[in-house]
């Protein structure tokens, strides 16, 4: 627990630095957007890909399969719980349900998993990320607009993160090990993930209207559902499963990440 709190404390300090950098004019809105794009399209895929540069074992492959299956289960739990507690009564019910179900598991989840569990954590997280994209661009789109086009769905699924998963998985199953210089290069790029993500998060936070957010009581309720109720429901179900605790914790962490936007 102390290690977790220490890692989270470090991340919050870097986030605070991002706020300061924006307030002092070192970051602006355009730079923040470019850094965010660089993070999502270059750094995150590098972290994901290099997480597969580990020695192949049947046990790891089976565990990865469990990670995919548990991720599907986690989303089904989230959808069910959200349908029960949020309902369709609010004018913004679709947005609220989308907010509770879909976390920012790439932006925040990868740095957390990488900081706490290293490559193993990111390795297991890739299962959740893949399932996230599948659900988000099908169920999520249908939830918001009532339908999902096949071409648009396929295009959206071909994100850099998913490409990183596919290439990494091919190398892992095919026992393809890159030269150490390339792995070190990917590792070096990936090491930017946590500090860059937190700096961007801080700069984004500095642009937000916090006063209006803090005075909207509905936001507190939805946040409680997203950050407490839903992760607790998933953790309760997972507590009965005799599986790798690191894998289970990584998926719970992904579920408990803040709201995603796309």
Where are these regions (language model features)?
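Alpha-helical transmembrane segments of multi-pass small-molecule/ion transporters
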Residues: 1-262
